[in-house]
Amino acid sequence: MVGSIGSLVLDVTIAPEGQLRLDDDRDASIRIGGGGQAANFCAWSAALGEGARLVTRVGRDELGERLIAEIEAGGVEVRAVRSPEPTGAIAVLLGPGGERTFARQERAVFGLRPEDVEEEWFRGLTLLHVPAYSLFVEPLASTARKAVEVARAGGALISVDLSSAAGIREYGGARLALELALLRPELVFASEAEAEELGAPLEGMAKVPVVKLGTRGVRVYGRRVPASRVETVDATGAGDAFAAAFCSAYLDGATPLEAAGRAVLVGAFAVSRMGARP
């Protein structure tokens, strides 16, 4: 059983046909579905055959219940605390090459407190995946630290995804590097931009440092594993798919390079379609 702590939100993904301009009116492909980095990781893990548990916080609203039912139907166990704030939502605007711009509202999950969660939710895990988004804002950050402590005491590996170059820039690269030094994750996933914003060698942050290179593949221990050649439709959730596949393979006994080879295939599938989930 793998687990993650963080967001379960509604993704509204918009792919305009052509360049948007102010006061313009364009046709677009629009997809509405579940998202959130922690939720996506769990959804992809379940699709790959892993038991998966998501710990999150949603509003006391119809949207929250619908998102929980949707991800549970995909095989994910959900431990959700209810919040007076509305369930989170993210608008994703896609560019012509699959690049993304986000507008987000996630106050519900950011308010998840240590006293809201039960330690039992983090026991019995083989791996706990922590998006850096879950470390950027209190009280969620303190809750994530508690989760790491409990999961590790039960024998779980810890993986961290650095989540966002802009988020690291706002939070502070040196501050996040210190956080990683204290958390001591076994695995760290980062894009090139995220690794640069961190400002510290990723190799010193974890036993297995993984740098995602986009269309050029992935780098592990300085060795590059090439990406599969596919047309990028929507990269939303592709990093979560990659991390889920890497962790699944690694837990099954694959070497880091073997795990990366499997993960790039799943990541390629993820970018070839709209939406963040399998």
Where on the chain are the PLM-derived regions?
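Conserved phosphate-binding/catalytic region of the ribokinase-like
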Residues: 26-27, 149-150, 200-278
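Short, conserved phosphate/pyrophosphate- and ester-handling motifs at nucleotide-, phospho-/glycolipid
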Residues: 45, 191, 239
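Ribokinase/PfkB-type carbohydrate-kinase core domain
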Residues: 1-9, 70-82, 95-223
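Short acidic/glycine-enriched loop/turn segments that link adjacent beta-strands
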Residues: 85-88
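Glycine-rich phosphate-binding loop at the start of an alpha helix
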Residues: 35-40, 145, 257, 261
